[in-house]
Amino acid sequence: MNLQFRLYLLFILLFISFANGKNEYEDKSTSIIDLLSSKSQFSKLIRRLQRNRLVPYLNRNKGLTLFAPLNEAFPDDSIEPNLLYYIVNTTELDRSVLRTQLKSSDGQQIALKIHYKAETGRAYDKVNNAQIVQSNWRADSGVVQVIDNIIDLPPPALEILSSEKDFSIFHRLSVAWVGEYSSVTMLVPDSSAFLNVYTNTELAYLYSMYAAEDVKTLIHQHILVNQRVYAEDVIEPKTFHYKNGISISMKFDKDQKKLFINDVSTTKYDLLTFSGAIHTVSSLINPEIISFTPAKYLIGIGAAWFSEKLSRERKSISVDKTSKRAILAPTNWAYREIIDIDYHIIENFDLPAPNKYALYVTNIKSGNSVGEDTNALVRIATGSAGEMYVNVETRSIQSENIGNVSLYVLDKDIEPPQPLLSQLILVDEISFSVRYLASLGLGDYTKVTWFLVKNSAWTQLGLVHLVLQQNLELLESVMLDYAFEGIAFYGSSDEAWASGNYTTLSNKEFLIEGVYEDSNSRNKRDLLRINNEIYEVQTRDLLVKDGVVHLVDKVKLPFSVSQKDMIIAGGRKEFLELLDKFEMLDMLDSGYPVVVPSLTGSDVNTKDSSFAERHIIDPEKRNFVISGSRLSVDSSPWISIQDYGYSELGNVYFVQNAIPTKRQNRWRITFISISGLLLSVGICVLCYKIYFKFFRNRFMNQGEREPLLAPADSDTMAGRRNSSSLSV
């Protein structure tokens, strides 16, 4: 009896328990399909299960969980989700990431992720993007989790990488490699991890097409190919191997909810992708696997084509970063395939200090005129702001260092020094000298040190310059006096000239010595004494093939130019005809200054001898004054000088108007004086009229207004009446 009572009581308790726990989805059916069929809210899902032939699968297999969308999740009958993604082979939702029955092309299961409300603080658990509105609807064959929406498949890995700013560098590098794998676990460093390890130059190289193999190697340090590893797969530590055999360890601390890779915590984990998962890390894994070289750095700073040639022709130099050297590389737009690679390499290089230059020996061999094989030189200067110039005209636009190697990208290509004329033809400041060398056929001399005169010095010669241009024999003697046998470099800004006797190409021997100038001088000049004449060297060591050029600020003629030659060269032969007419040509070249006015043919016939004598100046007898570009003779008005020529035989001055006679001067002075006086009187009269008119009107107006301003007394009025009577 007691046993029967106990059984009856147990039955009653079980009945009450089931009654209290019952909800609208509860049923006594034994299969998942029967559960769904019992509720009209799943009619659309059942039709899709039937079309996809999944009904037998759900009826036949046990221990499954189906995430079942309500009819409201299918607003359009055309929506056909892959329902295998809604089925997982477990009834226990005891982990965040669950592998579904949907498989990738390599047969691995695509996962979904549960976001539990206890962790998120939401009202419902979520699976990917859908909310679980009713959980754990159980059947004998499995469990149904009712959801309010269609479950989105995980996005492709590249979509996640491109959408996150922190992944931008990894995305840019990996875009060519990630998509080729059906299953992959990615250990993605954030952008700061790259910036902490690599310089801008190194990143620029990695972004280039030349870095494909290096980038692939680096990316493969951060992906586990053909493996889908989620955090809860490694609650017990596991070791995984990359394709190159290097291994890493992974461990998930479930209590701390942290995933560790090589004992370093990830910043995020289990970001699901269609091909696997992304775990983010704050540092690179094995970054040292990539070795950077000078050739790679050249690519990073914009000289990729030069880098390719360097790697082909000088492979040992392209990878050596321990030797102290400089590599001068033209930028891509200035690159030429016929480039002399060795001329761009300098061993034992130190950059000159600001505002200094130095000559450096390059690696290229340059045969000279006598068959000697020497290394070609290159001239490198540094500007005040640290900018670098190569062979004067070429500028460095970017620089970088790797190990002991200095790399410079140039805006133009450089080549070994060319013959004199070819090398200097584009140097504007000595265009006169270069043209004269070409005209005289002097450009082919070898093993010569040239002191070339700047254009400004030639133009300062005035009429003498015209004489030289018209007399090539004289011009050649001048040019040869500034060309010395042998190559004499300064070597650098800090080197002094090696004083001594030097032989010119005209077989003269000159003493050349440096001139000391106080180093504390504010405007210190670079001076040389050549044959007792002081010159300022304005540019040192311009390199040419088999020679060197220094630019100087003036020219000294080895002879005296006659006044007659200067007058002829200036095109004023009428003045010579006038002198010849009066047999006065012998007065030229006597040391007297000659002022040459502009004359016509008729002037030669009409002017008298006094006119000619007036323009040949004896400074001891006449007052001759020059001020700037004007002259005056015997206190005459200033006359503008149009051109001039200086010579030991006498200077020549070209003017437009003739020097006036003393009588003309007196009349001119008188006229100017009278004109000045009349002008002064006129101004005074005008001022008086203006003054009188203004103040008279002012006083009259005041007198007229006075009765209105103040009433007069009776005596005053009477006096005014009397005065009026008298005036009538």
From Swiss-Prot:
Keywords: Autophagy, Glycoprotein, Membrane, Protein transport, Repeat, Signal, Transmembrane, Transmembrane helix, Transport, Vacuole. Glycans are attached at residues 89, 404, 501. Gene3D superfamilies: FAS1 domain (2.30.180.10). GO terms for biological process: macroautophagy; protein transport. Residues 29-151, 154-285 form the FAS1 domain. The chain crosses the membrane at residues 671-691. GO terms for cellular component: extracellular space; fungal-type vacuole membrane. Disruption phenotype: Impairs atg8-processing. Residues 22-670 are vacuolar. Residues 692-728 are cytoplasmic. This is FAS1 domain-containing protein fsc1.
